C-alpha cells in the first residue's frame, strides 16, 4: 500500500516460513509494517526488516508462534501495541538504537523470550511490554525512560535482575507483580511515585528502601512479599497505601519517616515477624487492620498527635503487653485490640470519647483499665472475656452499657454503675461468675434487651439500688428470669429481701425494723427475642411457632401471633418473619445447647 510516496507492508500469503521485506517496492521506500500485517502467521520462522522501516504497526507479528528471533532495524522509531505479543517461541529480540517508543504489550506473552536488547535512545514504554515473559531473567531499562508502565514485567517468573534508569520518576501499577525470583532492586533517587501493587507477590524480594523524593505509594505496593525482611519508608510520603506490606511474613524491621500523616488500612496485616514499630509523631490516624494479625509484635510507640485508631488496627496482636495511649487520642474503632491476649493494661486519656464494639474483646491478660469520663456509651462486647480484669471504674457520663460488654469478666466481684446510666444491655454482665455485688443508680430505666443482663452470675447475692422499691418496679426487664431479680435488693440503702412473683401475688419484704407483706408490682417485661410462645425460655417450641407462622402467612392465612410474639420472632429485626428468622432460632438453640454461650449478636452477623 502506497501513502505519500511511501510503501506500507500489509500482509503476505498464508503459510510463509521465511520473510524478507524489501527496502523499496517499485521505487517507493518501504517505511512501515502495517497493523496486523502478519497476524497469526503461525508458520513464519524468520523475518528480515530493512533499515527503511520507520514504524511497526499494532499486532504486526502477533501470534506468530514459530518466530524465534527478531531484529528491529536501526531506522525504526516506533513499535506499536502488541506488535510481537503471543510469539511464544521468540527467544531473542534486538531493538535498533533509533527506537524511541514501545507501545503497550509489545512482547506480552512471549514466554520463551530470554534475551532482550533495548534501544539506547528509548524514551517511552507502554504498559505490559514484557508481561508474562516467563523466560526473561535480566533486563536493563535505558536511561531516557522516566516512566515504567503498568504491568511491564508482571508475571516474569524468572526475572531476577533489573537495572532502572537514574532519572526514572514513576513505576506504575503492578509493574513487577508476580516476579518471585526478584530478590534485590535499587529504586532510583529521582522516583516520586510507586503505583498500586507495583511489587505485589514478589515473594523473593528481601529488602526495600523508598527514596527521599517519593511522595505517593499505592495500595498493595509490596503485598505478599513473603521474603521481605527490611523496609525503610523515608522522604516526603504523607500517606501510605492500603495493604502496602500485608502478608510480608518475614518483615521484622520497618522504619517510618517523619512527615507521614496516616497509616493506610491493613498496611502491615499479618506481618507475623514484626516485633517492634515506632510510628512518627506526625501521624494522626492509624487505619483499619493496620497491624492486625502481627502475632510477634511486642512494642509499639504511638505518636503524640494520634487522634484515631481504626477498627481491627491491632487485632490478634497476641504478644503485645502494653500500649501507651497518647493524650490527644479521640476514638478507638471496632475490635481495635480484640484478641490481644497478652495485653495487661489499657489506660485511656481524658480525650478519648468513643470506643467501638469489641475493642478489648478476648484480652484475657488485661488487669488494669482506665476509661475517660467523656465516654457516654460502651458498645457491645467491649470487654468481653477479659477474665483477669479485677475491677473497672465506669465513666461518669456513661448512659448506656451495650450487649455483652462485660460478658465473662470472671475477675469482677463488685460493679458500681454510675449515676446517669439509663440502659444496661443484654448479657452486659452475663457469666461474670465471681460477681457478688452490683450498685445500680436510680437513673437506670432498662435492664436487658433480647436477653437478660446478668445470666450465669451464680455468685451474685446483693444489688444496691439508689431508688425506692416503687422506682425499682418501674425498670423494664427483658425477662423475670434475670438473675438480678433473684437476689437481695437494697433500696435507698435499706436491706430488703424480695422474691419476684407473678402479678396478683405478694412479695415478702424484710427491713431492720419490721416485716411487712406488700402487693408485688411485676416489673415491666417486654418481649424476649426468640421467645415466640412467651413461656420465658427459648427452645424448639419457639421454632415450631415461628415455622407455623411462616407457613400460614405464605398461603394467605392468619399467623395467629400477638404483636409481642411477632416482635420476638423477628430475630434479624427486618420487619418481617421468614425462613431467615427460623434459621437464626435454630442456630441459637444449637449453639447454646452445645455449651457455646452465645448471644443474638453472635448469631445475627
Q: Over which residues does each language-model region extend?
A:
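Short, aromatic/basic amphipathic alpha-helical patches
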Residues: 473-484
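Extracellular/luminal Pro/Thr/Ser-rich low-complexity repeat and linker "mucin-like" segments
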Residues: 5-10, 15, 378, 533-547
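Structural signature of tandem-repeat unit edges
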Residues: 3-5, 14-31, 42-55, 65-78, ...
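Cellulosome-associated attachment modules in secreted, modular CAZymes
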Residues: 500-605
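Short, solvent-exposed loop/turn elements at domain surfaces
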Residues: 7-8, 18, 555-556
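Consensus positions within tandem repeat domains that build extended binding/scaffold surfaces
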Residues: 34-37, 57-60, 80-85, 103-106, ...
Amino acid at each position: 500500500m502506497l501513502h505519500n510516496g511511501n510503501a506500507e507492508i500489509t500482509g503476505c500469503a498464508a503459510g510463509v516460513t521465511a520473510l524478507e521485506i524489501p527496502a523499496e517496492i517499485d521505487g517507493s521506500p518501504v517505511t512501515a509494517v502495517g497493523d496486523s500485517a502478519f497476524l497469526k502467521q503461525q508458520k513464519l520462522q524468520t523475518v528480515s526488516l530493512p533499515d527503511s522501516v520507520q514504524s511497526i504497526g499494532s499486532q504486526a507479528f502477533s501470534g506468530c508462534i514459530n518466530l524465534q528471533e527478531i531484529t528491529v532495524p536501526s531506522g525504526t522509531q516506533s513499535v506499536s501495541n502488541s506488535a510481537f505479543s503471543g510469539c511464544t517461541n521468540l527467544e531473542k529480540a534486538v531493538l535498533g538504537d533509533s527506537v524511541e517508543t514501545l507501545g503497550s504489550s509489545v512482547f506480552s506473552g512471549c514466554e520463551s523470550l530470554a534475551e532482550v536488547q533495548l534501544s539506547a535512545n528509548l524514551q517511552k514504554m507502554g504498559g505490559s511490554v514484557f508481561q508474562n515473559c516467563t523466560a526473561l531473567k535480566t533486563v536493563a531499562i535505558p536511561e531516557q525512560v522516566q516512566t515504567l508502565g503498568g504491568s511491564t514485567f508482571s508475571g516474569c517468573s524468572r526475572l531476577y535482575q533489573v537495572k532502572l534508569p537514574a532519572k526514572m520518576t514513576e513505576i506504575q501499577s503492578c509493574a513487577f507483580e508476580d516476579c518471585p525470583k526478584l530478590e534485590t532492586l535499587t529504586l532510583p533517587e529521582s522516583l516520586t511515585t510507586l503505583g498500586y501493587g507495583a511489587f505485589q507477590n514478589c515473594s523473593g524480594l528481601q529488602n526495600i528502601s523508598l527514596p527521599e523524593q517519593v511522595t505517593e505509594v499505592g495500595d498493595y505496593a509490596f503485598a505478599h512479599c513473603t521474603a521481605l525482611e527490611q523496609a525503610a519508608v523515608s522522604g516526603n510520603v504523607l500517606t501510605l497505601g492500603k495493604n502496602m506490606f500485608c502478608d510480608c511474613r518475614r518483615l521484622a524491621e520497618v522504619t517510618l519517616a517523619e512527615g507521614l500523616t496516616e497509616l493506610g488500612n491493613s498496611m502491615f496485616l499479618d506481618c507475623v515477624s514484626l516485633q517492634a514499630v515506632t510510628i512518627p509523631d506526625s501521624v494522626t490516624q492509624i487505619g483499619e487492620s493496620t497491624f492486625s494479625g502481627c502475632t510477634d509484635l511486642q512494642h509499639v510507640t504511638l505518636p503524640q498527635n494520634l487522634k484515631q485508631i481504626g477498627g481491627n488496627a491491632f487485632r490478634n496482636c497476641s504478644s503485645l503487653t502494653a500500649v501507651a495511649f497518647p493524650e490527644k487520642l479521640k476514638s478507638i474503632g471496632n475490635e481495635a485490640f480484640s484478641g490481644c491476649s497478652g495485653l495487661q493494661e489499657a489506660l485511656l486519656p481524658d480525650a478519648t470519647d468513643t470506643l467501638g464494639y469489641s475493642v478489648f474483646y478476648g484480652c484475657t491478660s488485661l488487669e488494669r483499665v482506665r476509661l475517660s469520663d467523656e465516654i457516654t456509651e460502651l458498645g457491645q462486647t467491649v470487654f468481653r472475656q477479659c477474665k483477669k480484669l479485677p475491677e473497672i471504674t465506669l465513666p461518669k457520663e456513661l448512659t448506656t452499657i451495650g450487649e455483652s460488654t462485660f460478658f465473662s469478666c470472671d475477675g469482677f466481684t463488685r460493679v458500681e454503675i454510675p449515676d446517669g446510666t439509663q440502659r444496661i444491655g443484654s448479657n452486659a454482665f452475663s457469666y461474670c461468675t465471681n460477681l457478688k455485688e452490683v450498685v445500680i443508680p436510680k437513673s437506670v430505666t432498662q435492664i436487658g434487651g433480647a436477653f437478660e443482663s446478668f445470666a450465669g452470675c451464680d455468685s451474685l447475692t446483693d444489688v444496691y439500688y439508689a431508688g425506692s422499691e416503687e422506682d425499682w418496679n418501674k425498670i423494664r426487664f427483658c425477662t423475670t428470669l434475670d438473675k438480678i431479680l433473684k437476689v437481695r435488693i437494697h433500696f435507698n440503702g435499706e436491706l430488703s429481701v424480695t422474691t419476684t412473683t407473678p402479678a396478683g401475688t405478694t412479695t415478702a419484704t424484710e427491713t431492720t425494723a419490721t416485716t411487712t407483706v406488700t402487693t408485688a408490682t411485676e416489673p415491666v417485661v417486654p418481649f424476649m427475642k426468640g421467645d415466640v410462645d412467651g413461656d420465658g425460655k427459648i427452645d424448639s417450641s419457639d421454632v415450631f411457632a415461628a415455622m407455623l407462622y411462616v407457613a400460614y402467612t405464605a398461603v394467605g392465612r392468619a399467623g395467629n401471633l400477638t404483636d409481642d410474639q411477632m416482635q420476638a420472632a423477628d430475630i434479624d429485626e427486618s420487619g418481617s418473619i421468614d425462613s431467615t428468622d427460623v434459621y437464626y432460632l435454630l442456630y441459637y438453640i444449637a449453639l447454646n445447647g452445645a455449651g457455646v454461650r452465645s448471644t443474638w449478636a453472635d448469631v445475627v452477623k
